[in-house]
Design a protein with these regions (language model features):
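Extracellular and organelle-lumenal recognition/adhesion modules and their flexible linkers in secreted
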Residues: 73-528
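Extended alpha-helical stalk/coiled-coil segments
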Residues: 2-90, 94-97, 104
Length: 528
């Protein structure tokens, strides 16, 4: 019985072991199947990766091809685009003077001296590319930040339009920069005065309470005709100017009078209405008065000027700057005009402000020169320069100069200047000498009379013809006998003599000369 029991137990154990072996075999089969599946997946992934790599290589090749095509297209476009400009781009000038913020030349020859600052020391240094500049007095100007500035003797004045070049002028308003001492009527309160943030000395010229309800004008500064400008000689023009501000509707009146030695006579007025900047002229001499007003959008000051032309029999002319109430109205309590830089001068346009004390004061002429030596020799000769004239309908003198030569025989001379005849005033011409007829021959005039700012130039060609250019518009060519300059002398820029009788009264910048012929496209520069 016991043996039978043991035999049953052994059989049970053997059955259990067989079941475990079957279970293990099933697990092994499952693992084998999973392994085969994983291998298949790995093979699939490998093929996918291989396909992706192939596609990436194809994309890279396509990208390189596209980049090469784009590069070729860009190079071709640049070549085509540049083709016309090979006739526009100018060669390096033989003489190049920027006149932007110094007297330094980029190319050309002019031995002179300039001042440089090293630390706290100012040193005068020699150089062979420095434009010569002289002026026997101080002078004022508006710097490139719009600030009123004073230049020392022989110091050039660079404004936003370039180098300012003016002739001699005298301001007949005394104490012109001392507002508290201006010769105003007693009915004006000028105690509120000072210097604004742009450096202008001003006074707030306020009407006193006793003038409320009145309609008369009131003087703010005066130059009596008995102490005024002598117009009995060659000079027939007088110009009064100032900077003003006031509430809209009020008016500033510029008045002219004459004096014959015993009697003062009213000539004419120019009324400026604040807000609209409309100018109205009245009086018997109204048709002889030209007036303009321009507002500076930054400082707010309105530069107001009026010029009168004297007629036969008039000897002394004076002027007044005045407050006037609204047109058709009366003075209201607290009416005022801000006034700065009053000037009354001999000439057909306003010039830079001249500071005076107890007597009229004169600003000397700006004299700008370079030698002809190593700068101008023979033809061909080409010139371009940026010009800004500060005068309008009335030229400051006969033929204001851009440049000419000093003391040369007529056959060597060149005069590049403005025409001042009534029909062509403000247009450019270039004059040379014709030995065969012993006459000076001017080119056809170029430019518009109403344009003050432009790029001017001229050509003297190898074939003995010449022409003038203004803002890219050229005149027809004409014959010239000019062949060159042999005399060692000076090129006078923007003026002729210290008397100021041929001065520009304006600005020059970027003066260039070439000893070669430029194409029409290269001469086509223009500005507004």
């Amino acid at each position: 019985e016991t043996a039978a029991k043991n035999s049953q137990d052994a059989a049970a154990q053997s059955e259990s072991a067989a079941a475990g072996s079957a279970s293990a075999a099933a697990a092994s089969a499952t693992a084998s199947a999973n392994s085969q599946k994983a291998a298949k997946t790995s093979e699939t992934n490998a093929k996918t990766s291989e396909t992706a790599a192939a596609n990436s290589a194809k994309a890279s090749a396509a990208s390189q091809t596209a980049a090469k095509a784009s590069e070729d297209a860009a190079r071709e476009y640049a070549s085509q685009a540049a083709e016309p400009y090979k006739y526009v781009l100018q060669p390096l000038p033989d003489v190049w003077i920027p006149f932007n913020d110094s007297l330094d030349m980029i190319t050309g020859f002019s031995p002179s001296y300039k001042k440089i600052v090293i630390g706290d020391d100012e040193i005068t240094m020699p150089g062979d590319k420095v434009v010569k500049f002289k002026r026997a007095s101080t002078a004022t100007y508006i710097n490139k930040s719009g600030v009123f500035s004073v230049a020392k003797i022989d110091e050039p004045r660079f404004e936003k339009e370039g180098l300012l070049i003016e002739g001699q002028r005298t301001n007949y308003f005394v104490k012109s920069n001392t507002p508290a001492e201006w010769t105003s009527t007693s009915n004006i309160d000028k105690t509120n005065n000072g210097v604004d943030e742009f450096g202008f000395s001003y006074a707030k010229m306020r009407t006193k309470d006793n003038m409320t309800g009145q309609s008369s004008a009131l003087s703010l500064h005066t130059c009596s005709a008995s102490r005024g400008i002598d117009v009995s000689g060659d000079n027939k023009y007088c110009t009064v100017s100032c900077r003003v501000k006031a509430p809209d509707g009020l008016r500033c009146r510029l008045r002219f009078e004459k004096y014959d030695g015993s009697v003062y006579t009213f000539l004419g007025d120019a009324y400026l209405t604040f807000g609209t900047l409309i100018i109205e002229k009245t009086g018997g001499a109204a048709n002889r008065i030209a007036a303009t007003a321009t507002k500076d959008p930054v400082t707010g000051w309105i530069f107001y000027e009026a010029t009168i032309e004297a007629v036969e029999g008039e000897t002394l002319i004076g002027s007044m700057i005045q407050y006037a109430p609204k047109k058709g109205g009366i003075t209201e309590a607290g009416d005022y005009i801000y006034l700065a830089t009053p000037q009354f001068e001999n000439g057909g346009c306003a010039s830079s402000f001249v500071i005076t004390t107890t007597a009229p004061a004169t600003r000397s002429s700006d004299m700008v020169t370079i030698p002809t030596e190593n700068n101008i020799y023979n033809r061909p000769l080409t010139c371009l320069v940026e010009v800004n004239r500060n005068w309008g309908d009335i030229p400051p003198n006969v033929a204001p100069r851009i440049f000419d030569f000093s003391g040369v025989p007529p056959i060597e001379s060149i005069t590049y200047a403005f025409n001042t005849t009534e029909k062509y005033y403000g247009q450019l011409y270039m004059q040379t000498y014709k030995a065969s007829t012993s006459t000076y021959v001017s080119s056809v005039f170029a430019g518009r009379t109403d344009v003050r700012k432009f790029i001017g130039g001229f050509n003297i060609y190898s074939d003995g013809t010449k022409r003038v250019v203004s803002n890219g518009e050229a005149t027809k060519t004409m014959k010239t006998e000019w062949t060159g300059v042999k005399t060692r002398t000076f090129i006078r820029i923007g003026g002729q003599a210290t008397s100021g009788t041929r001065h520009l009264f304006g600005h020059l910048r970027n003066l260039r000369l070439w000893h070669k012929e430029l194409t029409d496209a290269q001469m086509g520069e223009s500005i507004k």
